[in-house]
Amino acid sequence: MPETNDVISHLYYDLNDKIDSLEQRLAGAEDIYYSNSYVERLKALGSDVQYSTYPGGSISGTAFTDNTLYLTSIFIPKTSIISGIGYIISTQGSYTADEYNGIGLYSYDSTNEKLVLIASTTNDGDIWKAAANAYATKDFTTPITVNSGIYYVGLLYNNSAQVTAPILMVSAGQTTITPLINTIGLTTAKLVGGSVNTMNNLPSEILNTSITSVTIGAILYLY
């Protein structure tokens, strides 16, 4: 009959093995959590896209308005290095650029209910003149390491003269019901997406109360 100490020792090591196994499984769980099958297919085929706001379904277009910052939220489930943003222009813009044209990435400060700029692209007057219906990308000035959490991608358009407004490819389903889905279960100061008017540059901070709910549903890619 085994000695009591031997039994206790065996149970101890067996328990440790189970804990180690569980920790390894949990460590991989964050990779499983992000379940956008479209993105997983892109990655499996060799794309550098890590996350996307595109939920699938039909697509449409939303025309940009001068001096308007468009904000679209995305949840990032694990620590990631983001180098830039991909987007698709369905109608190429024809305009004379002024002020700032580009993209910013904002973290969310839930304590103070505000967005904080953490990365941005260089000012590029031609960014919204990308070829129509083609995938375009824009790098941040420096790749940014982000932790798990909610983030907002901001798209800013400025012009001094315009022939044709750039039209961004968007999710048609989201565009239709965004005013509703922007606020489900949330306080009025929190939105899944929206816009801020009279913006000549990317603000370093944006209060929740400054954001207006709009129907956009931007299709964006984080790589």
What are these regions (language model features)?
Residues G57-T68, I127-N133:
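Extracellular beta-rich ligand/substrate-recognition surface
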Residues L156-Y223:
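Short, surface-exposed beta-strand/loop patches at domain edges
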Residues D66-L69, I76-G86:
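Extended extracellular/luminal ectodomain segments enriched in beta-structured repeat modules
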